[in-house]
Amino acid sequence: MIIITPITNDPTTALLRLMAWLSPVFPVGSFSYSHGLERAVHDGLVVDAAGLQDWLQWLVRRGSGWNDAVLCAESWRCAMKGEDLHEIAELAEALAGSRERHMETMLQGGAFLAAARSWPCEIFDRLPPDCAYPVAVGAVAGGHGVPLAQALAAFLQAFCINLLQASIRLSVTGQSGVTAIMAALEPVLGETAARAALSSMEDLGSATFIADIMAMKHETQHSRLFRS
């Protein structure tokens, strides 16, 4: 039996959908990716909670997290306006700076679209079968009428939480350190989500070159826990 899931104007329903879609248990395989953090830990660039917090906040403010938020916002707008999503999908894929970053965003994007079909929506017919993760999240959120600012804040928080989970497995910090970082990052996530909501494609760009290099170096790391 197919259940038609309508666009929501109810804040509680929107919140519930975001919590489901961006939950660590949503089947996108995010637990298997470290976004280059594993290599940064291996090379001694991130050794404690303070360094981890700094690493994450710059990824969000000026790195891949920021670019993904801009792409997510543009995909949301295209979905809301009924515009074509293939161009933004192609751009998002092209912006993946290394083989593992490409794998990370494309596999998660495809898995997200497959799982999100439990909430039927016409947006799935307008998306390419292979789609980068931020485009998938933004388009589905827009297709369901989830408010943009909320979608971006949840997306960025999920990005950080996944890397915080990875940091525990990498013995950078423990659960108490992770919760402290989560609390400390709230202003960063809120401010970045607000900026991304007002962004355009001209705002794409990052300056976290070391993080990008770590993602590349991870490809040849002999012993590792994560796929990226």
Swiss-Prot record:
Annotated protein name in UniProt: Urease accessory protein UreF 1
Function, in words: Required for maturation of urease via the functional incorporation of the urease nickel metallocenter.
Xref: Pfam families: UreF
GO CC annotations, alphabetized: cytoplasm
Gene3D superfamilies: Urease accessory protein UreF
Keyword annotations of the record: Chaperone, Cytoplasm, Nickel insertion, Virulence
Gene that encodes it: ureF1
Membership in a protein family: Belongs to the UreF family.
Gene Ontology MF term list: nickel cation binding
Subcellular location: Cytoplasm
Keyword Methyltransferase: no
Quaternary structure and partners: UreD, UreF and UreG form a complex that acts as a GTP-hydrolysis-dependent molecular chaperone, activating the urease apoprotein by helping to assemble the nickel containing metallocenter of UreC. The UreE protein probably delivers the nickel.
HAMAP family the record matches: UreF
Domain of life: Bacteria
